Amino acid sequence: MKFVDEATIEVIAGKGGNGVASFRREKFIPKGGPDGGDGGRGGSIYAVADRNINTLIDFRYARLHRAKNGENGRGSDQYGAAAPDITLRVPVGTVVHDADTGELLFDLNRHGEKVTLAAGGQGGMGNLHFKSSTNRAPRQWTPGKEGEQRRLRLELKVLADVGLLGLPNAGKSTLISRISNARPKVADYPFTTLHPNLGVVRTSASRSFVVADIPGLIEGASEGAGLGHLFLRHLARTRVLLHLVDISSPDPDTDPIEQAVADARAIVEELRRYDPELADKPRWLVLNKLDMVADPDAARQRFVEQFSWQGPVFVISGLNGDGTQELIWALQDYLDAEQRKANLAQDQADGTYVAEDPRFDATRSDAAPPGAPRGGDE
């Protein structure tokens, strides 16, 4: 499922350091000649495509990126130090436009691809460069050049990792607002969600995944009923589907588990009618609204038995958050494992795969047993 993620940033490269007019002054050498050094180069700003990053959310809060200026030159032929460069890591698939003109500048579509967003200014020249046969004591020097400055628009078509599936009012929007930064409209009536919502779930500073909530499906969606069929095709690109099922029932005359099983079977049938491959995609069962159930464990057991379910199952409350942390961590571990498989396949296809060093393989035949003395130990 692809959504456009955008961020506008400003990049300012560093100014080059100034050259200097200086003359050698030592004892017994009254006319030592020019020895002014050049200024250092200003810091540049680069962008590198990183397959371990999947959104541009960090750039929405860090909009200004300014590199340092180069140092000025000094006497005794000392050049100024170059300023450190700044490298911005962006997701693979990021497109960079000039924010003022709309011109397409870069398309970072391969892991490790590096481009220059703003080049640092060159350092100025010291008076050493202006010495000639007719001018033995030049006093000229040049200032450092200004670094490039740009306003850039970063655009990424985000591929959602997790798709939420379920009937209208199953609690999908409540769940995505609970676990991510998305804030969809939530109300106690069906068809609250009229367009897809995208949320980023952060489990740590360096680990995250993207969840997509689409309008709820109803019976007959594969034939055009409701709104969900308009977005079913997008779920084909997700890695795992979360099938949300409401296990509560406001009607006291209705068995909530039997109704939930019937609703779940209707969703699976719509998937099969729309696309058999989509129905075979990895799917996890999420029983929602446990806060409205007297005995969640018994409800879970009854549902699994009647639904003949053998895959992963979680019981949560999207409203108060019960059980959502376990679901989030399980999803993150699963997606990380799938990403490692994809990275390995890509490295092998590109011919860049490097096997692990056998010295770090504890299962090799000549590995020392735990607690055994190492070489050099007494």
Swiss-Prot record:
It is found in: Cytoplasm. It is an enzyme of class 3 (hydrolase). SUPFAM superfamilies: Obg GTP-binding protein N-terminal domain (SSF82051), P-loop containing nucleoside triphosphate hydrolases (SSF52540). Residues 345-378 are annotated as: Disordered. GO terms for cellular component: cytoplasm. GO terms for biological process: ribosome biogenesis. Keywords: Cytoplasm, GTP-binding, Hydrolase, Magnesium, Metal-binding, Nucleotide-binding. Its EC number is 3.6.5.-. GTP binds at residues 166-173, 191-195, 213-216, 288-291, 317-319. The keyword Cytoplasm applies. Residues 1-159 form the Obg domain. InterPro entries: G_OBG (IPR031167), GTP-bd (IPR006073), GTP-bd_Obg/CgtA (IPR014100), GTP1-OBG_CS (IPR006074), GTP1_OBG_dom (IPR006169), GTP1_OBG_dom_sf (IPR036726), OBG_GTPase (IPR045086), P-loop_NTPase (IPR027417). GO terms for molecular function: GTP binding; GTPase activity; magnesium ion binding. Residues 160-336 form the OBG-type G domain. Mg(2+) binds at residues 173, 193. Belongs to the TRAFAC class OBG-HflX-like GTPase superfamily. OBG GTPase family. An essential GTPase which binds GTP, GDP and possibly (p)ppGpp with moderate affinity, with high nucleotide exchange rates and a fairly low GTP hydrolysis rate. Plays a role in control of the cell cycle, stress response, ribosome biogenesis and in those bacteria that undergo differentiation, in morphogenesis control. Monomer. This is GTPase Obg. It comes from Bordetella petrii (strain ATCC BAA-461 / DSM 12804 / CCUG 43448). The gene is obg.
